[in-house]
Amino acid sequence: MATESLKSTPPPSSSSSSSSTINPPSSTHKYPSTSTNKYPSTNYSPNYPSTSKSWSFSSKTSLSNLKDSLPENPHIYDFSEISKATNNFLQKPFSSSSSSVSWRCSLRGKELILFQRKFRRQIESPELQQRLLAICRSHHSSVIKLLGATTSGNYIYLAYEYVHGANLATCLRNPQNPSYTVLSSWLSRMQIATDIANGLDYIHHCSGLNSEFVHNHIKSLSISVTEDSLNAKICHFGTAELCGEIVGKEGSSSKNFGRSNSKVMKIEGTRGYMAPEFQASGLTTQKCDVYAFGVVILELVSGEEALRYVFDEGGGGYKRISVIERAREVMAVGGGELRKWVDKRMKDSYPVEVAEKMLLLGLECVDDDPEKRPDMGLVDGRVSRLYLESKNWAEKIGLPTDFSVSLAPR
């Protein structure tokens, strides 16, 4: 589940006046379950005007004041607990799919990943209470569960269950052995696509949150592939909501973004996965998640990176190659171009008609016009049907339909 090398920023001191004092809950509740980049960075951080600034989470709205009012308490950790679990934050950071620093540790007898995130805007107590409760109550087999949180100063610390495995980007493109992939069969990739579609549909429509809930971090680095079973789980569920990345309709209106006395808010994204409208305005919607999922579909079919740069010997610089542009070229040319584009490490063993349908679906999801992108519920249904077609194909030609693979380095 690790590919990015993370740089830790010193965590705020627990003695800071702005830090919230968080007491452990009175009763215990348990909840279920890198390589060096040689090319220009794909991390994207445009600046957009906003009326917000860097916010601290004051003791007035601290999580400790919320825990007693939550009918099913998430774990509200004391800051001293996470400090002890991470050896006062001196423990080697866990290399994860996030651009924020994280640690693998044990809290209250449970192995987890602790992420340090900075608040992006002020979140009032009732709003944070509603978000935290709904997110921690949510359960789906394809979504990594948020177990609890704590706050200190400008930071929120989010504790997610630890999943044994590797991220999808590493499974598709092993930096130590590019010619090898654990996802060497078509059916294994369709299983991954189905799991992600199921999980994202749940996040958008069934998680108990509002009808416009957005994940905002969908990419191959943010998908964990479990060891042995090769199932996919979506990471960072609820991060955008709890950190204040998602601005509501009122707060995101054009008049607010046009105020001359506005501050500048940094909007972060990953090149190759950002929808055009997000790049233009910094505002994210569910259709931005659909766009990012479409990119992941194209990655699964081709094995290619969402965006890469290769050295152009003729021009003396770097040439940009987008998986979306390549997919559009393949569709435009037609004929045998699809067979040339599909990941050769699957050894030409896949149902061609299903591969064509997956290519079409991926391109629909990355349409430049968000109104033309399908809803995630429709996408989930189509991917599930294509998975069944793939399974029937595999059974007819006698291929195994169950997977048990080690993700250890090769």
Task: Enumerate the language-model features and the residues they cover.
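Activation segment/activation loop of eukaryotic-type protein kinase catalytic domains
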Residues: 216-273, 310
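Glycine-rich ATP phosphate-binding loop
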Residues: 98-120
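C-terminal lobe substrate-recognition/regulatory segment of protein kinase catalytic domains
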Residues: 324-371
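Short beta-strand micro-motifs within the conserved protein kinase catalytic domain, predominantly
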Residues: 145-156, 164-165
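Protein kinase catalytic-loop region centered on the HRD/HxD motif
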Residues: 199-213
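Structural motif in protein kinase domains
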Residues: 163-179, 305, 337
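Conserved catalytic-loop aspartate of Hanks-type protein kinases
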Residues: 289
